[in-house]
Amino acid sequence: LAAPTKSEQWIKGVEVVVHLAAKVGIVGSYQEFFDSNVLATRKLLEKAKKNGVQRFIYASSPSVAHTGNALIGVGVHKAEPAHVRGSYSRTKALAEIDVLAAHSPDFSTMALRPHLVWGPGDTQLIERIVARARSGRLFLIDGGYSLIDTTYVTNAAQAFACAIDAPTSAFNRALMVTNGEPRTVRETLGRIAYAAGAKAPSRSIPFHIAMAAGHAAESAWRIRKSEPPLTSFLVEQLATAHWFDLGETKRFLEWSPSISLDQGFADLAMWYAKA
């Protein structure tokens, strides 16, 4: 993202660009997120069109349309940069808007929104959940009964592969990518912990207390310039239902998840057993 000369070298002679890179998390100034997620995407779009790229597939996020309300069996809502939470979501929303606006008869664009991608070797979601479970710091919010969608990594990769060869009618739109198997937060966290040989979370705290703690942690860790152990966004994600309708994705990409959550959890357990 920070090396425009290299990115142009990579683009020359290719027909399809799949743009996955982004600045994630909450640490950093808004400008840092904007530069990495918005400006870099705009430059990549410009270079792609200049070098004759035919298709541009952007890895977006469901958070670009999540304004705090529960999302229950919904399709794709439009990106809402003015109303979403945090610099990451806001800048990803702006970038998605730019990508779809760049669509033309000679330059097909698409945004895929994979939700909570996980699998063996994951250093983001899985590693953090397991570390907290092993240290006894993994907890539930309001019992952990909200339903959420997640995406096994193989299914996410296959969705992007299908997008590369998708019919032209599939482009000029955003599409959701998940396993299509909503489970409670309690079950999801518990099975991840169990796969790693750790105890499932049993402690639960009320939403309002967790949210206050999240805001306090954000303020304290902002001074340290490091990732806080809890954020208001994470609290919201753990306490709010968010699962989606995959009808359009399956139809336009001719794709469906090939690895079930149960198989994914089994594969995760096997990976930890060998680690």
Q: Which residues fall in each region the model found?
A:
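Active-site Tyr-X1-5-Lys
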Residues: 83-113
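Conserved Rossmann-fold NAD(P)-dependent oxidoreductase catalytic core, especially the SDR/UDP-sugar
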Residues: 43-87
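Amphipathic terminal alpha-helices
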Residues: 244-252, 256-275
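NAD(P)H-binding glycine-rich loop region in Rossmannoid oxidoreductase-like domains
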Residues: 1-39, 43, 47, 67
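A conserved pocket-lining segment of Rossmann-fold NAD(P)-dependent short-chain dehydrogenase/reductase
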Residues: 79-82, 109, 131-151, 155, ...
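Mid/C-terminal beta-alpha module of Rossmann-like enzyme folds, strongest
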Residues: 166-229, 262-269
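Glycine/proline-rich active-site loop of Rossmann-fold NAD(P)-dependent oxidoreductases
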Residues: 93, 106, 118-128, 154, ...
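Conserved C-terminal active-site "lid" loop/helix of NAD(P)H-dependent oxidoreductases
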Residues: 153, 190, 213-256
